[in-house]
């Protein structure tokens, strides 16, 4: 099953081939239709509690790995301001040993974000696709302990666009979700990564 397709031309800035980048992740997508509350900023903590805390292998939402820069949950959204709002909403899961980390570009330079990720024990990271990829490329952010990726799909911006409608976000989002280190763990037993659409 293909959940999203982006023409290769779109992300190669005028490449000659019209090949499509497809992401086959049907086994990783967790059915969240049982969530009965409106999918608002304030409801995200309840959403995570309902769908992220059931299996034995999973860390509690307020825990983090011993290694810095290694969240169990990544929340991916389309804009820095939205990421800041979601970060505030998720603070209830923050402890002195486990932070809810900001992983977005708005007012935070990449160098500063890299330094912060390398020093921070985070349970949850909230950010934009491109910044998360930049941190992964640097090695400041690690996915070894990652258990789930939550895509903020229900939020609609002032221009009436969702994260899957924004061309400037579509390509980085598909590239992020299609990264080899994630793709090979989608829906596969021990150490699997689940995809949740909020």
Predicted regions and their residues:
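Low-complexity, highly charged intrinsically disordered N-terminal segments
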Residues: 5-91
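Post-DEXD/H (motif II) to motif III coupling segment of the RecA-like Helicase ATP-binding lobe
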Residues: 140-151, 156-198
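Conserved helix-turn-beta segment of the N-terminal RecA-like "Helicase ATP-binding" lobe
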Residues: 88-104, 140
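Structural recognition of the conserved hydrophobic beta-strand(s) that form the central parallel beta-sheet
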Residues: 75, 124-127, 150, 195-197
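Conserved helicase motor
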Residues: 77-80, 101-112, 129-131, 154
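Conserved catalytic network of the ASCE P-loop NTPase/AAA+ motor domain
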Residues: 64-68, 93-95, 116-119, 140-144, ...
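P-loop NTPase motor module signature
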Residues: 1, 33, 102, 107-110, ...
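Conserved motor-coupling elements within RecA-like helicase/translocase cores
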Residues: 110-126
